[in-house]
């Protein structure tokens, strides 16, 4: 009686159940985020980067370790054991230093998001289109600066990371 069939019946979700409403609301939230992202006037490679970051499919140390790549899990910049996309692009001291230089709402944005996708959702609501475009460019520039630090052993100052993001957005 309490086997697989019982479990399946318990997990079956009716059209009007709270669980299905919650699942549907999450899908709708995702659609709103993606729709806003696809409408931004940013280079396709940056759009692809933010999309991949939001889905947590960037080649972070944590994701590489999940694929059984032997790698030290500590952050290459700060040595923290937190190596998530959210840490890399928002919480790491390098990222925080860059975000502190951005003027306006971005500088004062809350960092209590639990995932990068949650952060994107939050910022999508708070920022204007222009600010959101700048945010994507800065995130992409932080990622590139970290890669330069790791692969080329070249450290880019925070103000240069921000400047390159602003210039790239202006040129686009």
Region roles according to the model:
Residues 1-172:
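A helix-boundary/hinge signal
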């Amino acid at each position: 009686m309490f086997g697989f069939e019982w479990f399946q019946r318990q997990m079956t979700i009716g059209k009007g159940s709270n669980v299905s409403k919650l699942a549907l609301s999450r899908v709708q939230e995702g659609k709103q985020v993606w729709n806003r992202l696809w409408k931004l006037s940013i280079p396709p490679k940056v759009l692809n980067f933010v999309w991949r970051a939001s889905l947590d499919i960037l080649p972070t140390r944590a994701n590489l370790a999940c694929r059984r790549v032997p790698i030290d899990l500590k952050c290459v910049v700060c040595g923290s054991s937190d190596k998530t996309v959210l840490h890399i692009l928002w919480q790491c001291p390098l990222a925080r230093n860059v975000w502190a230089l951005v003027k306006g709402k971005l500088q004062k944005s809350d960092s209590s998001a639990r995932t990068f996708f949650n952060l994107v959702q939050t910022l999508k609501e708070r920022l204007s289109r222009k600010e959101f475009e700048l945010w994507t460019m800065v995130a992409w520039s932080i990622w590139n600066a970290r890669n330069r630090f790791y692969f080329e052993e070249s450290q880019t100052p925070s103000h240069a990371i921000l400047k390159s993001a602003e210039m790239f957005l202006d040129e686009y």
